[in-house]
């Protein structure tokens, strides 16, 4: 799926997946902690409070952390999270999605993260 070259445009829309609800991608923020904690727990992944805090309190000139949210059970739920260092040829170092709810979210989130890193490195070059 071709994605926009504007990093803002990547996060300003919702995405339809092969199955499941539409998802919205946005930069992670501290208020996402409960949702990220729940996502990791549901996937059986251990997380420390300091690790979670570091995940949502990142330096946006060096790192991107993106949350995927979807409307579930009457609320906006975190259904994915990914992170990448904003360096040339970087790949996501964190990528967790709820594949039971969102078929195809993993590749979409990975693509958006990689494009965000590439666009960022071109802008500062």
Kindly give the residue locations of the regions a language model identified:
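Short acidic N-proximal helix/loop "leader" segments that mark the beginning
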Residues: 1-20
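Conserved GNAT acetyl-CoA-binding A-motif
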Residues: 116-125
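Acetyl-CoA-dependent GNAT
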Residues: 46-93, 98-99
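Conserved acetyl-CoA-binding loop-helix of GNAT-fold acetyltransferases
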Residues: 102-117
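A short beta-loop-alpha structural element at the N-terminal edge
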Residues: 23-36
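Short aromatic/hydrophobic contact patches that present stacked aromatics
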Residues: 22-24, 91-95, 125
């Amino acid at each position: 799926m071709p994605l926009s070259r504007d990093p803002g445009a990547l996060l300003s829309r919702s995405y339809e997946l092969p199955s499941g609800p539409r998802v919205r991608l946005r930069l992670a923020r501290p208020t996402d902690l409960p949702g990220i904690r729940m996502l990791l727990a549901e996937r059986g992944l251990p997380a420390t409070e300091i690790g979670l805090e570091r995940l949502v309190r990142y330096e946006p000139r060096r790192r991107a952390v993106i949350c995927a949210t979807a409307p579930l059970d009457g609320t906006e739920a975190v259904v994915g999270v990914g992170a990448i260092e904003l360096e040339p040829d970087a790949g996501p170092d964190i990528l967790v999605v709820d594949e039971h709810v969102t078929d195809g979210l993993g590749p979409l989130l990975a693509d958006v993260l990689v494009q965000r890193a590439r666009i960022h490195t071109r802008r500062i070059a």
